[in-house]
């Protein structure tokens, strides 16, 4: 029931309401023809107002075709594109890798600084012992090199010379 009433309501909106002929005044057939002509004028005016201009029609067609083309391209290239989840996973793994690399660099920097401090301390310690040895050696009477207890002297290391000789062979033809 509601669908028929909706159809009647739609048709009533589209059509101009008919005028009733007063009793006995005019010809019913002439009045009906006049009403049909007026109704056609009303419908033509309605269509003219609702119809898009040629420019608007062409523009809307171009937009719809572009959307359709973009959809086809997206479908065709979908297997080569990464989804949002894939991109998030890639970004997350990249961030984790950068974080680990940064931690490793920090660790290496701290260890390098500690190593340099220890190296300086050992060099300072070695320098102080070598300075005292030199002082003790040069400070002895008669210029002799006598050893004093508790002072280490550097022992000369044997020098090794290695020479490589080429064997001269002549190839006979």
Swiss-Prot record:
| Superkingdom classification of source | Eukaryota
Family per record: Belongs to the FYV6 family.
PTM annotation (N-acetylserine): residues? 2
Upper classification of the organism: Eukaryota, Fungi, Dikarya, Ascomycota, Saccharomycotina
Cross-referenced InterPro entries, in alphabetical order? FAM192A/Fyv6_N
Transit peptide as UniProt keyword: no
Q: What is this protein called?
A: Protein FYV6
This protein's GO cellular component annotations are:
chromosome, telomeric region; nucleus
Compartments where located: Nucleus; Chromosome, Telomere
Keyword Endoplasmic reticulum included in the entry's annotation: no
Q: What does this protein do?
A: Involved in telomere length regulation and required for survival upon exposure to K1 killer toxin. Promotes fully efficient non-homologous end-joining (NHEJ) by a mechanism activated in postdiauxic/stationary phase.
- Keyword set, alphabetical order: Acetylation, Chromosome, Nucleus, Telomere
UniProt record, GO biological process: double-strand break repair via nonhomologous end joining
Q: What else is known?
A: Present with 468 molecules/cell in log phase SD medium.
One Pfam entry for this protein is FAM192A_Fyv6_N
């Amino acid at each position: 029931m509601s669908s028929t009433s909706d159809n009647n309501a739609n048709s009533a909106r589209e059509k101009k309401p008919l005028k009733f002929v007063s009793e006995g005044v005019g010809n019913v057939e002439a009045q009906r023809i006049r009403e049909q002509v007026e109704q056609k004028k009303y419908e033509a005016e309605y269509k003219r107002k609702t119809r898009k201009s040629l420019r608007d029609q062409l523009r809307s067609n171009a937009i719809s075709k572009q959307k359709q083309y973009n959809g086809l391209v997206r479908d065709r290239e979908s297997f080569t594109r990464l989804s949002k989840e894939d991109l998030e996973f890639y970004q997350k793994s990249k961030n984790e890798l950068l974080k680990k690399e940064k931690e490793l660099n920090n660790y290496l920097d701290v260890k390098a600084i500690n190593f340099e401090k220890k190296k300086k301390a050992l060099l300072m310690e070695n320098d102080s012992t070598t300075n005292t040895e030199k002082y003790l050696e040069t400070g002895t009477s008669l210029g002799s090199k006598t050893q004093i207890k508790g002072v280490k002297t550097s022992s000369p290391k044997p020098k090794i010379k290695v020479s490589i000789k080429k064997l001269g062979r002549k190839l006979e033809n």
